[in-house]
């Protein structure tokens, strides 16, 4: 029983039910000598409520006994899923019984049996996940094939087929169509589809389990029979498993929608059927888009992402955030799935882990930036050049600025993209201009300067997009800067008054801890001294802080995932 309802409470409720039923039977029998009159009294008033409760309690006990025989002790998750879905089914079946009151009693009994089968199918789906998650690859193939789960799967499949055949035979009797049996036939057909879905998922899990055992045996032979190496513990992960599961679910959902449409055509109109068609159609559309995006974006995923060098791994945390295992350079691993790949946002993952993640989401698991941002940037660059000319921004009173942020002895430099005027303060401007003229400095020059320059890529929707490059490697981030309405504009024709008319400029939008603070500027530089390609400048000490913060974030995410896993195990073990 679920945690909220203990056995003593159930025992007290059942005892009270029997006591009230005994009192009702005694009262009706002593009130009338005629059995028909006593039966009529039992079916009216408070006696009807008592006997209705008596029948419901015994039906629930019967359902519980059948479920216990098929599946044994239920887990807390299975109980939760039953009570989450049961109220909707009861309302639907009650509406069917009320609208079809003239149907034979056999039809109503079939509805009760259908409810029992429906609950058993819910438990069957959850039990499949429980069997393969708890036992994993440690169970033998013969043990799973001879388990109670496979027995329940076989029994429910046979029962669904027999009930479908029975309902089809009673749909048209003596030339008269019975809509209730037609509806039940379509409902049992959907239960057969559920059994087929479980069979497909079970076959997929069994295939993965067999391949995993073979991979482990091959690793043991290759490593000389030891069990201490990481390669010995490596399990086979079926590539594209989630996509296969999504395709199975999409196929079953489409077939169920077709059955619902048939039911809506031949059976009197029902709002529950329309709701089912609507919800399942949305679910099928989402599954189709997921499969399509995965097929479109992942065809050349390996070539699109750059390899990670040993220097880059040394400069950052080399732990994969998905599998929590250390990443190795490309030269030290022969397996493609174990190679480290760098995303456009600069985060690094195992290629195999990335493919598994991409089956569920097309974004980075750490910063949620799109993995294919570079492909969209090239299109956005062309579109921005065509749609946001400088004259249009001038008319709307929009001014785009970039703050060059320095640390300690570094100064702040503000550049107006459209006015052609640059303003600076301090004694390090020559070093900055050298970086602007030559793009990014070399690693040695950047180490001496103590800062990193970031060139602007493009503009779109009043935003400036640019890449942030690590001074110690090729790691990159994508950042954006949003333009704001012009306050005190710097007049490019009169640069002498620039320092008097400038205002404090908002900081660019940087990811995480890279966001800096701007300050006011004092010295004006003419337009000819302004750099051709504007850049952001930030101290390398900021990047070191970012690495520490990212490392702490990964540790926190690891702890959260472990806590969530332990919570699921505790919830599964509780009854």
From Swiss-Prot:
Subcellular location: Endoplasmic reticulum membrane
Domain of life: Eukaryota
Pathway(s) served: Protein modification; protein ubiquitination
Gene3D superfamilies (UniProt xref): Zinc/RING finger domain, C3HC4 (zinc finger)
GO biological process, alphabetically ordered: ERAD pathway; proteasome-mediated ubiquitin-dependent protein catabolic process; protein ubiquitination
Reactions mediated catalytically: S-ubiquitinyl-[E2 ubiquitin-conjugating enzyme]-L-cysteine + [acceptor protein]-L-lysine = [E2 ubiquitin-conjugating enzyme]-L-cysteine + N(6)-ubiquitinyl-[acceptor protein]-L-lysine
Residue segments, region Disordered: 486-520
GO molecular function: ubiquitin protein ligase activity; zinc ion binding
Keyword Zinc-finger: yes
Keywords carried by this UniProt record: Endoplasmic reticulum, Membrane, Metal-binding, Transferase, Transmembrane, Transmembrane helix, Ubl conjugation pathway, Zinc, Zinc-finger
Spans within the Cytoplasmic topological domain: 1-4, 68-79, 125-138, 201-575
Topology feature Lumenal, residues: 26-46, 101-103, 160-179
Xref: InterPro entries: HRD1_E3_ubiq-ligases, Znf_RING, Znf_RING/FYVE/PHD
The keyword Cell membrane appears for this protein: no
Annotated zinc fingers (RING-type), start-end: 320-368
Listed EC numbers: 2.3.2.27
Sequence intervals crossing the membrane: 5-25, 47-67, 80-100, 104-124, 139-159, 180-200
Bilayer topology term: Multi-pass membrane protein
Subunit and partners: Interacts with HRD3.
Function: E3 ubiquitin-protein ligase which accepts ubiquitin specifically from endoplasmic reticulum-associated E2 ligases, and transfers it to substrates promoting their degradation. Mediates the degradation of endoplasmic reticulum proteins (ERQC), also called ER-associated degradation (ERAD). Component of the HRD1 ubiquitin ligase complex, which is part of the ERAD-L and ERAD-M pathways responsible for the rapid degradation of soluble lumenal and membrane proteins with misfolded lumenal domains (ERAD-L), or ER-membrane proteins with misfolded transmembrane domains (ERAD-M).
Family: Belongs to the HRD1 family.
Protein name in UniProt: ERAD-associated E3 ubiquitin-protein ligase HRD1
């Amino acid at each position: 029983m679920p945690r909220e309802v203990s056995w003593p409470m159930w025992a007290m409720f059942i005892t009270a039910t029997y006591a009230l039923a005994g009192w009702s039977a005694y009262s009706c029998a002593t009130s009338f000598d005629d059995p028909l009159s006593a039966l009529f009294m039992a079916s009216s008033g408070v006696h009807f409520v008592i006997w209705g409760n008596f029948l419901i309690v015994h039906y629930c006990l019967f359902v519980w006994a059948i479920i216990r025989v098929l599946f044994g002790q239920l887990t807390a998750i299975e109980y939760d899923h039953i009570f989450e879905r049961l109220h909707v089914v009861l309302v639907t079946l009650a509406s069917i019984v009320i609208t079809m009151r003239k149907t034979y009693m056999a039809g109503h009994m079939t509805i009760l049996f259908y409810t029992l089968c429906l609950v058993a199918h819910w438990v069957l789906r959850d039990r499949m996940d429980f069997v393969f998650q708890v036992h994993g690859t440690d169970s033998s193939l013969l043990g799973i094939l001879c388990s109670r789960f496979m027995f329940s799967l076989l029994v429910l499949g046979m029962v669904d087929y027999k009930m479908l055949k029975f309902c089809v035979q009673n749909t048209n009797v003596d030339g008269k169509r019975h809509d209730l049996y037609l509806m039940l036939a379509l409902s049992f057909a959907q239960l057969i589809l559920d059994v087929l879905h479980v069979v497909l998922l079970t076959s997929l899990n069994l295939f993965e389990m067999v391949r995993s055992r073979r991979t482990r045996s091959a690793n043991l032979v290759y490593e000389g029979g030891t069990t201490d190496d990481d390669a010995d513990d490596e399990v086979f992960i079926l590539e594209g498993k989630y996509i296969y599961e999504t395709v199975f679910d999409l196929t079953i959902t489409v077939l169920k929608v077709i059955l619902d449409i048939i039911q809506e055509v031949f059976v009197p109109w029902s709002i529950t059927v329309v709701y089912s068609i609507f919800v399942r159609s949305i679910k099928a559309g989402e599954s189709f888009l997921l499969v399509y995006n995965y097929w479109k974006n992942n065809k050349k995923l390996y070539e699109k992402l750059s390899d990670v060098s040993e220097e880059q791994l040394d400069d950052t945390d080399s732990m994969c955030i998905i599998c929590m295992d250390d990443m190795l350079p490309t030269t030290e691993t022969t397996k493609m799935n174990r190679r480290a790949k760098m995303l456009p946002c600069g985060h690094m993952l195992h290629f195999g882990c990335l493919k598994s993640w991409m089956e569920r989401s097309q974004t980075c698991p750490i910063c949620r930036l799109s993995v294919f941002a570079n492909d969209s940037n090239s299109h956005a660059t062309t579109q921005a050049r065509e749609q946001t000319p400088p004259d249009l921004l001038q008319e709307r009173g929009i001014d785009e600025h970039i703050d060059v942020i320095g640390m300690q002895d570094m100064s702040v430099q503000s550049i107006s993209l459209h006015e052609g005027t640059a303003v600076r303060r301090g004694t390090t401007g020559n070093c900055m201009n050298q970086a602007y003229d030559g793009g990014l400095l070399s690693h040695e020059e950047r180490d001496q300067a103590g800062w990193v320059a970031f060139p602007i890529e493009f503009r779109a929707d009043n935003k400036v997009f640019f890449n942030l490059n690590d001074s110690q490697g090729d790691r990159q981030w994508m950042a954006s800067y949003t333009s704001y309405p012009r306050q005190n504009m710097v007049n490019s024709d009169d640069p002498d008054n620039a320092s008097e008319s400038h205002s404090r400029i908002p900081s660019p939008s940087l990811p995480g801890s890279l966001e800096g603070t701007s300050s006011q500027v004092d010295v004006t530089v003419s337009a000819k001294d302004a750099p051709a390609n504007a850049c952001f400048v930030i101290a390398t000490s900021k990047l070191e802080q970012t690495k520490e913060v990212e490392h702490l974030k990964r540790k926190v995410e690891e702890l959260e995932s472990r806590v969530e896993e332990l919570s699921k195990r505790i919830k599964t073990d509780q009854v």
